[in-house]
Amino acid sequence: MITIDEQKCTLCGECVPVCVRRILQKGKTSVEIIDPAMCLYCGHCKAVCPADAFQFSEGNDQFLSVPNKKQIPSPAVFFRFLRRRRSLRFYQDRLVEKTKLKMLIEAGRYAPTGSNRQACEYVVVSGRKALDKVCTLAIRNLQEQGKELQKLIDEYSRKKKPLPEEWASRQTLPPVWERIAGKWEEGVDQLFHHAPALIIIHMNKGIATTPEIDAAIASTQMVLLAETLGLGTCYIGFLIWAIENSGELKKKLGISPENKALVAFTVGYPKVEFLRFVARNPAKVGWVGEFEG
């Protein structure tokens, strides 16, 4: 619910043009809300109001002052910071504090979402005992998927038929999953890399308008904040495949049947200090308009 304190409103009109749904207009004594039900709750109006006349029934206390320009890092510094983040697969045998894990969740919570649905939900698995149980279930499922996939690959090969696109991209994975399973039996964790914590983002796709994008943005903010906390992270795409293929694993993680796991990443203190940035391929860019050609 959004309301306007008429005593505070100065009719400056700053809020009217920034309203995404165009439901604000100047009245005689204050700005008026034409159709409250259409409000997106994006907070633009409250964020620009010099008099702080807008009130939200939820989250009103979260509209804090933004940092001044001097507190924002320069483009060069920020770009180098972005490049600093890399996949970490070597972790110290050290528990990540709950306070830091909660900070990562907060970073995800404040990420933008399609139509402001804010549908992201999180599972935090902490400690090797709990992680080992999840890892065992995940590897077992991946191994089963690998065997089924290999049967299909062999069948299509015998018939000399091309694999369907969805399988073709995974045809190299069965031996990878077998190797991961074999190493796990030897006590080597090649799925979670012996990390002390794991975070999974999931959501009800019936609520979210852009679920995959929302989860990706939230996780990006989280892994970047992790860098400032002295933590490293690594995305674990194989786990998502396992969760969505195993009702047992989904239940173990407390993810509702109607929700879909979208992103998973490990978290922990680095065991190795990297001295150089990671290399990337050149960007493929098509310019349209002013800079075309």
What do these predicted ranges mean?
Residues 1-293:
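Acidic, surface-exposed loops and disordered segments
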